[in-house]
Amino acid sequence: MPIGVPKVAYRLPGESTPQWVDLYNRLYRERVLFLGSGLDDELANQLNGIMLYLSAEDASRSLFLYINSPGGSVTAGLSVFDIMNYVQASVTTIGIGFAASMASFILAGGERGSRIALPHCRVMIHQPQGGMEGQASEVVLEKEEIVRLRRLIGRLYVDLTGQPLSTIANDLDRDKYLSAREAREYGLVDLVATTETATV
């Protein structure tokens, strides 16, 4: 039985009396964001809007993006990646549970030195996928777009991980699963968190 989003007390800056706000709004005020489901345009737009707002409010304070997601839309993921790199506030990414497909790409796209995986996080990378249907000319165009996106994602993974393109291309050919430690060795994250390294 779902319990809904709990309410928590929060005192807005300049207010003397706390208000009851939902948990996620409280966490947003602390600059904590979640990618906790499949990524589509709606969720990407919500994350992007929150990052833009919080960065404009105070670019000197980091944002913390917790990721537990099977991935999702390539274009939605690229929009989150671009906004993370566009905003002036640094974005720390933290993998929790499972970061797969575009979610692993977003995890790797955090601020260098601030890409973290919790000890039991699993990470999976693979090539962009898409279903093709329609007239033959449309299928050809869609296939060309998938190939273009695959090359783009491959080049970006090279930049993010330091792995050679040949390794990335080979590893993207099929689902590649990594433990938190293996993700660090691969260059997808910089740190495997422990209780001593936890920040938020």
Swiss-Prot record:
InterPro entries: ClpP, ClpP/crotonase-like_dom_sf, ClpP/TepA, ClpP_His_AS, ClpP_Ser_AS. Its EC number is 3.4.21.92. The keyword Plastid applies. GO terms for cellular component: chloroplast stroma; endopeptidase Clp complex. Transmembrane segments: none annotated. It holds the Pfam family CLP_protease. One of its GO terms (biological process) is protein quality control for misfolded or incompletely synthesized proteins. CDD domains: S14_ClpP_2. It is an enzyme of class 3 (hydrolase). It catalyses: Hydrolysis of proteins to small peptides in the presence of ATP and magnesium. alpha-casein is the usual test substrate. In the absence of ATP, only oligopeptides shorter than five residues are hydrolyzed (such as succinyl-Leu-Tyr-|-NHMec, and Leu-Tyr-Leu-|-Tyr-Trp, in which cleavage of the -Tyr-|-Leu- and -Tyr-|-Trp bonds also occurs). It comes from the Eukaryota. Gene3D superfamilies: 2-enoyl-CoA Hydratase, Chain A, domain 1. Component of the chloroplastic Clp protease core complex. Cleaves peptides in various proteins in a process that requires ATP hydrolysis. Has a chymotrypsin-like activity. Plays a major role in the degradation of misfolded proteins. Belongs to the peptidase S14 family. This is ATP-dependent Clp protease proteolytic subunit. It comes from Ostreococcus tauri.
